[in-house]
């Protein structure tokens, strides 16, 4: 037990899927896992452990933003001996080559947060995800005929849709081709790197400044299910 997780150590699997939304964690457990049980409900940050294709896996919500995922991923890595975390979620994009419903795998995250400085005194703006875990995810996507966009992404402290000027928002970042914008990956990758663990981030793009496509609830669910299945299949390899 930690200040934020009530689970016993044996309740948590070595591999964790981490959606931001607690209700998405519940949805994944109910739809994809067998013999699952609720292992955390503190602050309604739901965690479930069950079996997928006979392999044990935990689905544990992170909440939104680096501070929240920083707490949960650190405690899972440090106190529960979790080896791998695959973040799964949604993202936006201001890349002309990325369309709504594209699935993006982050090669690494650029961020202007002070998380690294406050955690252990470092001052970096970019950190890579785990190459071995990415390799597994890419091979799984190829096997399942899921088109995957692989490249650098941005982790922001501001929800980009609420930025007063999207062009100014974009100008805050380097000119490199960043595929997607989300709010958690940098913190997850940083902690995995410092603690000698593995981390990856899969995202389904749900909004873009270059694509006005409006998703129906059915389209959103189906696209997320594809990403969830990809993450689960990669997690059990």
Residue ranges and their predicted role:
Residues 35-41, 145-152, 237:
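Flexible, glycine/charged-enriched surface loops at secondary-structure junctions
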Residues 55-62, 169-177:
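Short, basic, glycine/proline-bearing loop/turn elements
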Residues 136-144, 191, 230-237:
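Generic non-transmembrane alpha-helical segments
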Residues 186-219:
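Zn-dependent metallopeptidase/amidohydrolase metal-coordination segment
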Residues 209-237:
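His/Asp/Glu-rich mid-to-C-terminal helical/loop segments that flank catalytic regions of hydrolases
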Residues 1-127, 131-136:
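Metabolite-binding pocket within alpha/beta catalytic cores that recognizes anionic/polar moieties
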Residues 22, 92, 154-159, 187, ...:
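Glycine-rich beta-alpha junction loops
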Residues 124-175:
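Active-site rim beta-loop-alpha module in soluble metabolic enzymes
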């Amino acid at each position: 037990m930690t200040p934020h997780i009530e689970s016993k150590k044996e309740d948590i699997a070595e591999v964790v899927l981490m959606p931001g939304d607690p209700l998405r964690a519940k949805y994944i457990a109910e739809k994809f896992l067998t013999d699952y049980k609720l292992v955390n409900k503190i602050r309604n940050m739901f965690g479930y452990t069950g079996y997928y294709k006979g392999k044990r896996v935990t689905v544990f919500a992170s909440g939104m933003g680096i501070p929240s995922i920083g707490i949960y991923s650190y405690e899972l890595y440090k106190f529960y001996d979790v080896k791998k975390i695959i973040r799964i979620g949604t993202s936006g994009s201001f890349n002309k080559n990325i369309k709504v419903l594209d699935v993006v795998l982050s090669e690494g995250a650029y961020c202007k947060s002070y998380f690294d400085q406050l955690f252990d005194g470092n001052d970096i703006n970019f950190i890579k995800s785990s190459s071995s875990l990415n390799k597994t995810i890419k091979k799984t996507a190829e096997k399942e005929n899921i088109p995957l966009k692989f490249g650098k992404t941005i982790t922001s402290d501001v929800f980009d849709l609420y930025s007063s000027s999207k062009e100014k928002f974009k100008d805050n970042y380097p000119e490199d081709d960043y595929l997607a914008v989300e709010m958690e990956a940098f913190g997850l990758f940083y902690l995995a790197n410092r603690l000698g663990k593995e981390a990856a981030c899969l995202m389904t793009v749900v909004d873009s400044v270059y694509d006005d496509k409006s998703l129906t609830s059915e389209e959103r669910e189906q696209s997320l299910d594809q990403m969830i299945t990809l993450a689960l299949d990669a997690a059990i390899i």
